[in-house]
Amino acid sequence: MKSKIFSFQIGWKFRRYWKNYTIQSLLATGSVFIVIYFLSMQHAVIVASIGATTFIVFAMPEGLTAKTRNVIGGHIVGLLCGFLCSLVSHPSILSSALVYALAVGVSMFIMVATDTEHPPAAGTALGVAMTGITLPVLIVVVLSIVILSILH
C-alpha cells in the first residue's frame, strides 16, 4: 500500500485557472515586497499579518474574511487594540506576555462584536503591542489594507 503522506496532485481548478493563480501570486508577491521594503524586520509580526491578509484576499477572495469590511475593519481594530495595549506599562516578562495576549484577545472580541473578523488582524494587534506604532507603520498598514481591498 502506497503512503499518501507526501503525495499530492495538481487539482483540476489549478489546471483550469493556472493563469489566474499565477497573476494572483505575482500580485501577492509584489504587495508583500512593498510592505517588507517599507517596514524593517523589527516589525516582522506586522509584515506576517499583511502577508496572511494578502493570501486570504488573493487565494480565497469569496471568503468572509476577504471582504473589504473585514480586511479594513479588522486591521483598524488590530491597530487600535495594539496601540492601546502598547501604552500599558509592562516591565516584566510576565506582564509583557499578558499585555500582548490581551491585545490579541481584545481585538478578537471587538472584531467578532463588530462583524469585522479578519484573523491576520490579530497579528497586527500583537505586532503593534510588541513594537509600538509609528507613523510609517500606520501609513504602510493602512495603505496596504486599502490597496489589497481595491485589488480584491
Please identify what each model-predicted range represents:
Residues S86, M111-T114, G123-M130:
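Generic transmembrane alpha-helix signature in multi-pass membrane proteins
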Residues E62-N70, M111-A121:
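Membrane-helix interface "capping/anchor" motifs
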Residues M1-A101, G132-H152:
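Alpha-helical transmembrane segments and their membrane-interface boundaries
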Residues I46-I50, H118-T124:
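Transmembrane helix boundary and interhelical junction motifs in multipass membrane proteins
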Residues P91-E117:
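Internal alpha-helical transmembrane segments of multi-pass membrane proteins
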